[in-house]
């Protein structure tokens, strides 16, 4: 598990999209780091259209064809509350339809935190445990 932590509007989602596209397409990340090629499940909790535009721009930059039939990048159909078991189970149902998931992106923490206090150890612990659960199942 890795977290991209920085103030708002500093490019965290750009980095996540870049990494996700590299893994989904089996290309070295930043032409320097080897990746394990496979499916990526991207949980989009804000800016769905912005993420799609960034993915399209990434494909143009790296001259990689983007088609529904060949993409390994899968987007959630709904938001996620990572502190609510029913929300997590609904997301898992969608994820189980995809084989060989190598990366799960949760974008953003604030929107998937379910009204918890990010500074409260109990709330953050619950969030991390539920992320661990996703990671271990997939």
Each predicted region: which residue ranges?
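Conserved inter-motif catalytic segment of the P-loop NTP-binding fold
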Residues: 28, 34-129, 133
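The conserved Walker
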Residues: 8
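Hydrophobic positions on the alpha1 helix immediately C-terminal to the Walker A/P-loop
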Residues: 15, 19
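Short hydrophobic/aromatic beta-strand immediately N-terminal to the Walker A/P-loop
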Residues: 2-5, 41
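Conserved glycine(s) of the Walker
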Residues: 11
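Gly/Ala-rich phosphate-binding loop of Rossmann-like dinucleotide-binding domains
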Residues: 24
